[in-house]
Amino acid sequence: MKVLDITASVANGTVKFLLRSPLHGLVSSRVMLITVSGRQTGRLYTTPVNYVRDGDTITVVSRSHRTWWRNLRGGAPVAVRVRGEDLKGVAEVVVDDKEAVAKALLALHPRYSAERAARRAQDRVLVRIKVA
């Protein structure tokens, strides 16, 4: 295991712990937990992700090389923990609309310029979650 992998694993574990604790307010305004089911194994995977919420829609942007979002292609049920609240929803993945990905990046990172968001969108995917 690489040093960066170990560091990321420890950091993710710490963030997961915080988001499940009464101290979630320290990070839960911008970070949530998403739980997805593996398409082939059925195993549950929980990952902390940055998000922005607009009503019943939660938007997440992930790097293309990450694997968790691939289980959501074609639409899939998910569980999320947002600001201390557990919700169920349905997620869809947007891979080919880089303009939509750039727009989502601007919502997640308001200090980005449009050019920076467009550059970063090239190796990102957009996940839209409709929560009930």
Predicted regions located by residue number:
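Short beta-strand segments
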Residues: 29-63
